[in-house]
Amino acid sequence: MATPAVPVSAPPATPAPVPAAAPVSAPASVPAPTPAPAAAPVPAAAPASSSDPAAAAATTAAPGQTPASAQAPAQTPAPALPGPALPGPFPGGRVVRLHPVILASIVDSYERRNEGAARVIGTLLGTVDKHSVEVTNCFSVPHNESEDEVAVDMEFAKNMYELHKKVSPNELILGWYATGHDITEHSVLIHEYYSREAPNPIHLTVDTSLQNGRMSIKAYVSTLMGVPGRTMGVMFTPLTVKYAYYDTERIGVDLIMKTCFSPNRVIGLSSDLQQVGGASARIQDALSTVLQYAEDVLSGKVSADNTVGRFLMSLVNQVPKIVPDDFETMLNSNINDLLMVTYLANLTQSQIALNEKLVNL
């Protein structure tokens, strides 16, 4: 079961700079449409196809910035069509549940980036629940970025998603990620592409440069802003980020956290007995904390909390009631079974070694 940690505080809404209108080449069989402002997202009902030349490698120019309140250009802009709202949490809860494997994959992609690349981007995969969006997987997407333009290999992104669907058919495209501490004008153009693949996509930023001394992780969703009939802008609204773990992921995270106290940042794998001992020590510390809290409540040092009391009562009721003699009998039986398995394994190993020597004679 995934156990969320303390939510990361969401920063205030960040208006993104909106680049100028970006022409995108259309397929040969379809006449080129009138250029529209880059801030107007494309409807989700028109995803990019493999036969579309623009989907192979999209190169979009972004020469300057246009404020969201700027006057309309000379030509009549295309009407802004907001994408459909992401089903589930975003009308209310606005919660993104992030698994640690996502962060590890993003950091690994950043460390392996091409020489001269300022940041890396990629696609976020996961599932949509009733009250939250759970990001469980991701993959990086090659792109080239300069001051004037950004080019994204959309065909590579589509092929990678098709491969992921064969392994995890329930995972959907939820949005995209980028390394860095801020949202650039090119982020609006990339976000427009992902609006075709997912309704109201998520934009996740991971500060791999550790600008504030820590790896800041933020999630946003885009919102159109402006006067109807004028050039529309985009505002990125922050979302609440929580961390979720599977049991296997939690073991890896606990092991990685131990490297914080190692001078060389390296730690070896512990044996099964050491893991059992560590788990027992953690349980003992937790029980000591619970007992101290109960004593403080009884002595009047701490006011009683009904929520904590109900939780402790539920925890106590889950403990099975076993007679000490029966428990000792079950423990001895399990120990005897373990000793028998160990004896048979050693006997089999000896027989195999003896057989090899007889064959070599």
Curated annotation (Swiss-Prot):
This is Eukaryotic translation initiation factor 3 subunit F. Gene3D superfamilies: Cytidine Deaminase, domain 2. The gene is EIF3F. InterPro entries: eIF3f, EIF3F/CSN6-like_C, JAMM/MPN+_dom, MPN. Belongs to the eIF-3 subunit F family. Residues 1-86 are annotated as: Disordered. GO terms for molecular function: cysteine-type deubiquitinase activity; metallopeptidase activity; translation initiation factor activity; translation initiation factor binding. It is an enzyme of class 3 (hydrolase). The lineage of its organism: Eukaryota, Metazoa, Chordata, Craniata, Vertebrata. GO terms for biological process: formation of cytoplasmic translation initiation complex; proteolysis; translational initiation. Its EC number is 3.4.19.12. The modification N-acetylalanine is found at A2. Phosphorylation is enhanced upon serum stimulation. Phosphorylated during apoptosis by caspase-processed CDK11. CDD domains: MPN_eIF3f. PROSITE patterns: MPN. Residues 9-20, 30-40 have a biased composition (Pro residues). It comes from Pan troglodytes. Keywords: Acetylation, Cytoplasm, Hydrolase, Initiation factor, Phosphoprotein, Protease, Protein biosynthesis, Thiol protease, Ubl conjugation pathway. GO terms for cellular component: eukaryotic 43S preinitiation complex; eukaryotic 48S preinitiation complex; eukaryotic translation initiation factor 3 complex; eukaryotic translation initiation factor 3 complex, eIF3m.
